[in-house]
């Protein structure tokens, strides 16, 4: 009887105070001339219980603001720095200046060595740079605490339908297969930027808006026994399948960017952006996984914190969750924990 009461109490506690589920991360870009300071921005992260951030470069002011906050960090190596990191000494210096000087006060989780590098334009330096950064981490005995990866985009995918047939393009396998092998051998994860928005606007005839916005009332695509009610799950399973075909087995995939613009292009509206971000955040917090990998949490980073008026083309300026005056565009709950707060 005592055991029964304990189980009931645990159940009630779980319902009233949900503590499981992935926290939703946010990408923090700084390409705007009207944005809040880095310290004000990190304070905004904390006010809204945003527990994960992706930085695209080792901005010193942002890193200082992140000290002792407990916010997990993906720190990026800019593409322009990759070639220099093929020199082991330069990689050690980069790690010392941009990671070790802040650790452990800053909670680094991943080092993203490059973002959406084209295999034909710099692809040859990505893996050597990754290896050197990893070796530098190993020299500091941090290789098990901070993982090395790189962020890819969906242009590397060749076959994408059905999701179980996902495969990388034949002409990029020389690049991506060794990267996946490295990630597998170091127990890391692949970072993937996944945008249902661009898939939809590129093919609105075959992809419905409701499928892209998580608002379809029923399954839209069947892949054998797997039913897909939203495009995000389908695209992520395409990446999982492609990774498997490149020898990665069950290598985790982190969705390092996903977003929907509120202005500036086809289907770019406030209402569509609100639907996409709120529905994606809810799905991430629920830890439901995908049809291919059900029940596995999907670490996901929403793109982006602010509208950035110095980006181009026009569509790229309007992915912000917040206006530059720090006011939210729409309510989003970033964490499922009991102290989680919704942006009102």
UniProtKB/Swiss-Prot annotation:
Enzyme Commission number(s) = 3.2.1.39
Q: Where in the cell is it found?
A: Secreted
InterPro entries assigned: Glyco_hydro_17, Glyco_hydro_17_plant, Glycoside_hydrolase_SF
Q: What induces it?
A: Induced by infection with the Cucumber mosaic virus (CMV). (Microbial infection) Specifically down-regulated by Heterodera schachtii (cyst nematodes) in nematode-induced syncytia.
Q: Which UniProt keywords apply?
A: Glycosidase, Hydrolase, Plant defense, Secreted, Signal
Q: What does this protein do?
A: May be involved in plant defense against cyst nematode pathogens.
Q: Which Gene3D superfamilies match?
A: Glycosidases (3.20.20.80)
Write out the GO biological process terms. carbohydrate metabolic process; defense response to fungus; defense response to nematode
- GO CC terms, sorted: extracellular region; plant-type vacuole; secretory vesicle
Q: Which GO terms describe its molecular function?
A: glucan endo-1,3-beta-D-glucosidase activity
- Name of the featured protein: Probable glucan endo-1,3-beta-glucosidase At4g16260
List, from the UniProt record, the residues annotated as the active site of this protein.
Answer: 116, 257
Q: Which residues form the signal peptide?
A: 1-21
Q: What does the similarity note say?
A: Belongs to the glycosyl hydrolase 17 family.
Under catalytic activity, the entry for this protein gives: Hydrolysis of (1->3)-beta-D-glucosidic linkages in (1->3)-beta-D-glucans
Q: What is its main location?
A: secreted
Whether Transmembrane counts among this entry's keywords is no
């Amino acid at each position: 009887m005592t055991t029964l009461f304990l189980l009931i109490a645990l159940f009630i506690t779980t319902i009233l105070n949900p503590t499981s589920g992935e926290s939703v991360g946010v990408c923090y870009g700084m390409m705007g001339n009207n944005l809040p300071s880095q310290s004000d921005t990190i304070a905004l992260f904390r006010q809204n219980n945003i527990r994960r951030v992706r930085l695209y470069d080792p901005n010193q002011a942002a890193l200082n603001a992140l000290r002792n906050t407990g916010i997990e960090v993906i720190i990026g190596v800019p593409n322009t720095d990759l070639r220099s990191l093929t020199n082991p000494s330069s990689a050690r210096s980069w790690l010392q200046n941009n990671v070790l000087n802040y650790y452990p006060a800053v909670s680094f989780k991943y080092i993203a060595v490059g973002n959406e590098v084209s295999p034909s334009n710099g692809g040859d330096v990505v893996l050597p740079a990754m290896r050197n950064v990893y070796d530098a981490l190993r020299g500091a005995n941090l290789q098990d605490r901070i993982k090395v990866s790189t962020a890819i985009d969906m242009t590397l995918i060749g076959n994408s339908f059905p999701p179980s047939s996902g495969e990388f393009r034949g002409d990029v396998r020389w690049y991506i297969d060794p990267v996946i092998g490295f990630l597998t051998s170091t127990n890391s994860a692949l970072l993937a930027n996944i945008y249902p928005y661009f898939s939809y606007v590129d093919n609105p005839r075959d992809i419905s808006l409701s499928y892209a916005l998580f608002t379809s009332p029923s399954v839209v695509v069947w892949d054998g026994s797997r039913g897909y009610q939203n495009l995000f799950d389908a695209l992520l399973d395409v990446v999982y399948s492609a990774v498997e075909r490149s020898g990665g087995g069950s290598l985790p995939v982190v969705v390092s960017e996903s977003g929907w613009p509120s202005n500036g292009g086809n289907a770019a509206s406030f209402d569509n952006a609100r639907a996409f971000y709120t529905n994606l955040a809810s799905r991430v917090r629920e830890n439901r996984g995908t049809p291919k990998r059900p029940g596995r949490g999907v670490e996901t980073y929403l793109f982006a914190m602010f509208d950035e008026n110095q980006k181009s083309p026009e569509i790229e300026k309007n992915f912000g969750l917040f206006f530059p005056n720090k006011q939210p565009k729409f309510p989003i709950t970033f964490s499922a924990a009991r102290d989680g707060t919704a942006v009102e």
